A protein has these predicted regions:
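Polar helix-capping/helix-linker motif
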Residues: 116, 155, 167-170
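Short acidic/His-enriched helical or mixed secondary-structure segments at domain edges of catalytic enzymes
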Residues: 161-186
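An amphipathic alpha-helix signature
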Residues: 65-68, 134-141, 156-160, 207, ...
Length: 224
């Protein structure tokens, strides 16, 4: 894990990185005693969030080989360009609805959150969301109860409804009907959602390049 990359100097030129982000989280948290849930695509850095404003986090990770396939359709870029960004572009930025976020490489992104161990965490693999949605929902419930002393109690009917409402096919239908802010001119946002598409799409050379460069984190997450 390249700790040197996460030094202050490497983050100073990103205008979103400042103490204002921490202060914003403090203000939002102080507005109510309820649990606030924030979504981000960013790598984790001490100037982005910390234990003074963060009770815990849920990190959703996906097989980088499938990310390449998904992002190719989403961005309109070529496979090799996306693979290069995924592996080597440490300062890769995205702009989400006007907000800049630092993605960095897949490996640095994963490690930045896995090494954030001063608050409780729940790591969820995208593939498990597809295969075992009920188990994942129960894990999320228990995690939220733990970090905020909640008393969420879900019946089987509640769980089934959650799974139905968040089912990929249902979300895709809703996007067809109502649109979705994060869709692009190249692709709808909820396009396919399948796992292991890379096996039929990426070349052997492309797969080897990804696996050779990301093998430590991929092995840790049992992707290889």
């Amino acid at each position: 894990f390249e700790n040197k990359f996460f030094s202050d100097n490497n983050f100073l030129h990103f205008d979103w990185v400042s103490q204002n982000i921490i202060e914003c989280q403090k203000i939002l948290n102080n507005k109510s005693n309820h649990l606030n849930i924030f979504k981000t695509h960013s790598v984790r850095h001490k100037k982005f969030t910390n234990e003074t404003v963060n009770a815990g986090f849920i990190y959703i990770v996906r097989d980088p080989r499938d990310i390449v396939v998904s992002f190719k359709n989403f961005s309109g870029k070529k496979f090799d360009e996306i693979i290069n960004e995924l592996i080597f572009q440490k300062k890769l930025m995205i702009n989400t609805n006007g907000a800049k976020e630092l993605l960095s490489t897949w490996d640095l992104h994963v490690q930045s959150w896995l090494n954030y161990n001063t608050v409780p965490r729940l790591i969820i693999k995208y593939e498990d969301l597809k295969l075992n949605p009920k188990e994942v929902v129960l894990n999320i419930k228990e995690f939220l109860n733990k970090i905020h002393k909640l008393k969420i109690d879900l019946s089987d009917q509640h769980i089934d409804k959650i799974i139905e409402n968040t089912n990929f096919n249902n979300l895709s239908k809703l996007e067809n009907q109502n649109g979705f802010d994060e869709a692009t001119k190249y692709s709808k946002f909820f396009r396919s959602g399948k796992s292991n598409q890379w096996k039929d799409i990426l070349s052997k050379t492309q797969v080897q390049l990804i696996e050779n460069n990301l093998q430590t984190s991929m092995k840790y997450l049992n992707y290889i």
